[in-house]
From Swiss-Prot:
GO biological process: cell chemotaxis; dendrite arborization; mesenchymal cell migration; negative regulation of cell population proliferation; olfactory learning; positive regulation of chemotaxis; positive regulation of ERK1 and ERK2 cascade; positive regulation of phosphatidylinositol 3-kinase/protein kinase B signal transduction
Topology term for the membrane: Single-pass type I membrane protein
Compartments, record wording: Cell membrane
Keywords annotated in UniProt: Cell membrane, Disulfide bond, Glycoprotein, Leucine-rich repeat, Membrane, Phosphoprotein, Repeat, Signal, Transmembrane, Transmembrane helix
Ranges: LRR repeats: 92-113, 116-139, 141-163, 172-210, 215-238, 239-261, 262-281
Record organism: Mus musculus
Annotated tissue distribution: Highly expressed in embryo and placenta. In adult, expressed only in brain and ovary. Not detected in kidney small intestine, heart, spleen, testis, liver, lung, thymus and stomach.
Cytoplasmic side stretches: 383-426
Entry comment on modification after translation: Highly glycosylated.
PANTHER family, per database record: LP06937P, TROPHOBLAST GLYCOPROTEIN
Residues in LRRCT domain copies: 289-352
Protein name according to UniProt: Trophoblast glycoprotein
Superkingdom assignment: Eukaryota
Length: 426
């Protein structure tokens, strides 16, 4: 039939165009989908749509107040007035800067996260307003190697701030470098006034450094610019791995109570810009016993009197002090700016000065003698009547004895009285 014949070719052309369109669509879907997810003939259209709209996983989030670099594994939250540690820190962070913010307290578990910040190695918290660091504040940072708390006015540093519950023989702190420069609070914020407050502050820092075995792996410790007057006893007793110790720009007047004997790995000891006047033999002997140490002593007010003689002799022989040629006298006035290495015994007036121990002995002896004299006078005063009677008896006895002696002398001197006395005796 003509009608049927006329419809046949047009219908065939339509089917051909549909087939070509289907092939084009199949090619586009195959090109946009991953090679491993090419659909089979039995795949549904929904699967085609899902495979075509697949996207790569989103990048780790960065806290809004911070700058993050995943390539450098660094997060910087600097001068953002943060009041606490951001909660959404990315787990890849290795170097974290939280400086110049407004955090006043660092509570226990301040860095506890899920997943944990296991790769964090360097943490800088300097320049905040931290006043309190609680026990276990860094407990959930198993990879932490370097911690900087400088320029924070710490009034309460827990004895377990660097330890936490994991500070034991089997699990000491991983810290290798601890920076505590200028953490002393202002004078008006110290407890019990200025001097007592400084003593309490020194004890607080010492307690945190010697808490158990937490810091036995510490190799670098910086305590500069903290106004220390003395180093607390046993401050360094639990730090056997220490290689670098910075105590410059304090107010140290003596190292009498400090012991460096167990710091067998110590390489650098910085004591510049303190108030040291002389170093005693016990300290010099400890330094001499440390195989690799170098001690820096510049800018101290050395007093060049007889007490300096042993130190001068030691300086002339030792190689422990690299800057010894720059050490000069500050007192007395006539010795000002004289180099310590240029001094000899005649310059130090040793003949006119007694050893301090001998001076102390003489003072003590004088006090004892004065006390004995006072007690003796008090006893005499209380027994004055009896003493007066006793003295009268002695006087009478002496008088009788002298009268008898005088009588015998007169008889012996006159022969007539002698014969008379003999006849009388007969």
């Amino acid at each position: 039939m003509p009608g049927a014949g006329s419809r046949g070719p047009s219908a065939g052309d339509g089917r051909l165009r549909l087939a070509r369109l289907a092939l084009v669509l199949l090619g586009w879907v195959s090109a946009s989908a991953p090679s491993s997810s090419v659909p089979s003939s039995s795949t549904s259209p929904a699967a085609f749509l899902a495979s075509g709209s697949a996207q790569p996983p989103p990048a780790e989030r960065c806290p809004a107040a911070c700058e993050c670099s995943e390539a450098a594994r660094t997060v910087k939250c600097v001068n953002r007035n943060l009041l606490e540690v951001p909660a959404d820190l990315p787990p890849y962070v290795r170097n974290l800067f939280l400086t110049g913010n407004q955090m006043t307290v660092l509570p226990a578990g301040a860095f506890a996260r899920q997943p944990p910040l296991a790769d964090l190695e360097a943490l800088n918290l300097s320049g905040n307003h931290l006043k309190e660091v609680c026990a276990g504040a860094f407990e959930h940072l198993p990879g932490l190697r370097r911690l900087d708390l400088s320029h924070n006015p710490l009034t309460n540093l827990s004895a377990f701030a660097f330890a936490g519950s994991n500070a034991s023989v089997s699990a000491p702190s991983p810290l290798e470098e601890l920076i505590l420069n200028h953490i002393v609070p202002p004078e008006d914020q110290r407890q019990n006034g200025s001097f007592e407050g400084m003593v309490a502050f020194e004890g607080m820092v010492a307690a945190a450094l010697r808490s158990g075995l937490a810091l036995r792996g510490l190799t670098r410790l910086e305590l500069a610019s903290n106004h220390f007057l003395f180093l607390p006893r046993d401050l360094l007793a639990q730090l056997p791995s220490l290689r670098y110790l910075d105590l410059r720009n304090n107010s140290l007047v003596s190292l009498t109570y400090a012991s460096f004997r167990n710091l067998t790995h110590l390489e650098s000891l910085h004591l510049e810009d303190n108030a040291l006047k002389v170093l005693h033999n016990s300290t010099l002997a400890e330094w001499h016993g440390l195989a690799h140490v170098k001690v820096f002593l510049d800018n101290n007010p050395w007093v060049c009197d007889c007490y300096m003689a042993d130190m001068v002799a030691w300086l002339k022989e030792t190689e422990v002090v690299p800057d010894k040629a720059r050490l000069t006298c500050a007192f007395p006035e006539k010795m000002r700016n004289r180099g310590l290495l240029d001094l000899n015994s005649s310059d130090l007036d040793c003949d006119a000065v007694l050893p301090q121990s001998l001076q102390t002995s003489y003072v003590f002896l004088g006090i004892v003698l004065a006390l004995i004299g006072a007690i003796f006078l008090l006893v005499l005063y209380l027994n004055r009547k009896g003493i007066k009677k006793w003295m009268h008896n002695i006087r009478d006895a002496c008088r009788d004895h002298m009268e008898g002696y005088h009588y015998r002398y007169e008889i012996n001197a006159d022969p007539r009285l002698t014969n008379l006395s003999s006849n009388s005796d007969v």
